[in-house]
Amino acid sequence: MKLPRILITAMKSGAGKTMLTCGILKAMKMQEINPASFKCGPDYIDPMFHKTVIGISSYNLDSFLCGENGVREILKKNGAGADISVMEGVMGYYDGIAGISSEASAYDIARITDTPAVMILDCKGLSVSAVPCIQGFLHYKEDSRIKGVILNRLSPMMYGRMKEMIEVQTGIKVYGYVPVMKDCALESRYLGLKLPKERKDTEDKLTRLGEQILKSVDIAGLLELAENAPELQENAQYSTESVRTKDTVRIGLASDDAFCFFYQDNLELLQEMGAELIPFSPLYDKQIPEKLSGLLFYGGYPELYAEELSKNESMKTSIKKALNGGMPCIAECGGFMYLQEYIRDESGTEFPMVGFLEGKSYPTGSLKRFGYVTLTGGRIFG
C-alpha cells in the first residue's frame, strides 16, 4: 500500500520532538498540505498538541500494546487519504522497554512500518561533535532508517557550515534548522507537557513556530522523502463483525477537563463493536446519563480539579448508586482516583470523591513507576 510517511525522532527526550513535530504539521497546514499525525508509544498528551494543529485526532502507534500487525493497521486505517503521515517518536530513537532494549522504541515503529526517520539534533553547545553523534546513531543498527536531520536551537549564522560538515562527513541530508525560540517553548509537569487548553497562547506559539519552519526547514524535501517511503506491508483484513453486539450498548464516557486522556482507537473500536459512547462531565453535569449499560473513566488530572469534583455531590451520588447496583465500569489512572474516597491536592487538602473504592490518592512529588507492566489474568478483588 502506498502511504507517504516520515518519523520525527531525536537522540533523547527534551531535544524538541514535540515542538518541531507540531511546527512541521503547522507549516504543512499553512501550505494546504493534508497531514495525518501519530505518536510512538502510549503518550496521551503529545497527540493533543497534534490535534490542536491539524484539527483531527492523532493516533498512537505502540508495538508493545498493539503488536506489529496492530501498528500497521492503525497507520494504514488513519493515514490513508492524507497527503503525508507524520509520526512523532518517543524518548531517544532506540530507547525501548525497561531502558535496556529497543523493543517498543521509535526505531521499532520505524522498522515495523518501514518508515524513513528524520532526527532532531539539539545543537545547543554543539558543533563538530554533531558528526560522531549522528554517525553513532546511523551505525548502531544496520537498518537504522535514519535519512536526515533537522538542527534545533542553532544560530542562523552557523547553519551553512554545520549543514555542509554533516552532509559531507555522514552522507545524510540536513533538512533545515530552527533557531532558539524561547517564546515558543512548551511547558511541562510530572506526566509530560502541560495540556494545550491550559495555555491561551498555545495556538499563537504553534503559528509562530510554523512560520519559522516554513522559512528554515525544507518541507518540500520532507514530502519527497515521505513519498519515497516503501509500500506499507499489508496485513490480513481486520474485522470486528464477529464481536459486534446485535443491540447498541450505551456506555457513559467521562469526558471533560479533568478526564481527557483517551486513545482514539480504543473509542472507535468500542463503537465498531456496537457501543454508543455517551459523553458526560463529572465536573459540570448533575448526574450520569440515563439508560446506561456501563461507565468508562479514563485518565486526566482530577487532582487539579479536586475541589470542583468534590462539590458536585449529585454526580458523585449517581455514580456510586450505579456502581453499587452492579453497573460494569472501567476506571484507570485519574478515573480510578476519582472513584476512591479522597484525593489530596498539592497543598495537602483532602477532597471527598465518589467513595466506591476504599483508599485515597495523593501526590508523591516525583514519578514512582514509569513504563509497561504485564499482568496475569484473574480476579482483582475477592
List each language-model region with its residue ranges.
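Internal gly/pro-rich beta-alpha loop/helix module
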Residues: V128-V243
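A short helix->loop->beta-strand "cap" motif at the edges of active sites that frequently abuts
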Residues: T115, I172, N324-M327
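C-terminal and late-domain segments of enzyme folds
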Residues: A110, K215, R244-D247, F259-Q271, ...
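ATP-dependent carboxylate-amine ligase catalytic core
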Residues: K2-M19, L25-T113, L121-G148, P156-G160
